[in-house]
UniProtKB/Swiss-Prot annotation:
GO terms for biological process: DNA replication, removal of RNA primer; mismatch repair. This is Ribonuclease HIII. InterPro entries: RNase_HII/HIII, RNase_HII/HIII_dom, RNase_HIII, RNase_HIII_N, RNaseH-like_sf, RNaseH_sf, TBP_dom_sf. PANTHER family: RIBONUCLEASE (PTHR10954:SF23), RIBONUCLEASE H2 SUBUNIT A (PTHR10954). It is an enzyme of class 3 (hydrolase). GO terms for cellular component: cytoplasm; ribonuclease H2 complex. Coiled coil: none annotated. Manganese or magnesium. Binds 1 divalent metal ion per monomer in the absence of substrate. May bind a second metal ion after substrate binding. It comes from the Bacteria. Residues 78-293 form the RNase H type-2 domain.
């Protein structure tokens, strides 16, 4: 879902309201002055003067205020930082987040290497090209282990805010290395409104604007590079955790994870499970029920 934030003049806001007055709808949010339900989009006009447009038709209505969408190809031809995470949907293993800095002169090399969204590449291909990317591309990789994940979730963070913290920190540390991107793109995992809300909790900040875009790994090579390196980091962590416990840990959160989790629970108890899995997943309760049979 597209999400666009603007700060137009009060005159333009009133003109917009007059034009779309039949689409005005009630809102329980005390910070929203006006809320409009339009075909393929919603528009929230805040007391601060900001406007949030969301939905497939967001760009169409944003054009009323002079907004012009940047073509994907033009964004691709900029020095760019792209970020992505892997492990969020897997019960076992940590959460890997990577920020990568890619310049246009590296595009041919990356395409010849076969860089693409990690979801479209085999694990074998990822393990093959990731070491090359780590050597050739400036990046910052972060891995939150399952044990640390379990420690912070429910305390200071939730499943979304912890990703905001990791993406922000990866970008911050990469910028500290001296790279100068003209654009920063995050593969969207939440709304811009949510991202900004959780970002306010973080200490390390930077002034560069960011763009949250859905399916960004298919649009920007910098995000694709991050996707591949993050997947490699996640797979390596999954293997290492399994080796220490003596089990082959599956990726994902299906019945295979339930089965292995129950075996680990029986052998090592909750301490062993906390070492290798994200405990707030439903798989934990399913594993317990397996042992009760």
């Amino acid at each position: 879902m597209a999400s666009i934030t603007l700060t137009p003049s009060e005159k333009d806001i009133q003109a917009f309201l007059e034009h779309y007055q039949t689409s005005l709808a009630p809102s329980k949010n005390p910070y929203i002055r006006y809320f409009l339900k339009l075909p393929q989009a919603t528009v929230s006009i805040y007391t601060s003067g900001k406007i949030l447009l969301q939905g497939e038709g967001a760009e169409k209505y944003a054009s009323f205020f002079g907004y012009q969408a940047v073509e994907q190809t033009s964004g691709q031809n900029l020095p760019l930082i792209g970020t992505d995470e892997v492990g969020n949907g897997s019960y076992f293993g940590g959460l890997a987040v990577v920020a990568a800095f890619v310049t246009p002169d590296q595009h041919d090399f990356l395409r010849k290497l076969g860089v693409g969204d990690s979801k479209t590449l085999t694990d074998q291909k990822i393990r093959q090209i990731a070491p090359i990317l780590k050597e050739k591309i400036q990046h910052q990789a972060l891995l939150l282990s399952p044990s640390k994940y379990n420690e912070v979730i429910g305390d200071r963070y939730n499943a979304v805010s912890v990703k905001v913290a990791l993406h922000n920190q990866a970008i911050y540390l990469l910028l500290q290395k001296g790279v100068q991107p003209e654009k920063i793109v995050i593969d969207a995992f939440t709304s811009a409104k949510n991202y900004d809300k959780y970002l306010a909790q973080e200490t390390n900040r930077f002034s560069n604007p960011i763009s949250l875009e859905e399916k960004a790994e298919g649009k920007y090579l910098a995000v694709a590079v991050s996707s591949v390196i993050a997947r490699d980091l996640f797979l390596e962590n999954l293997e290492n955790l399994g080796r220490e416990l003596g089990y082959q840990l599956p990726s994902g959160a299906g019945t295979a994870s339930d089965k292995v989790a129950s075996q680990i629970l029986q052998a090592y108890g909750m301490q062993g499970l906390s070492f290798c899995a994200k405990l707030h997943f439903k798989n934990t309760e399913k594993a317990k029920k397996r042992l009760e049979r």
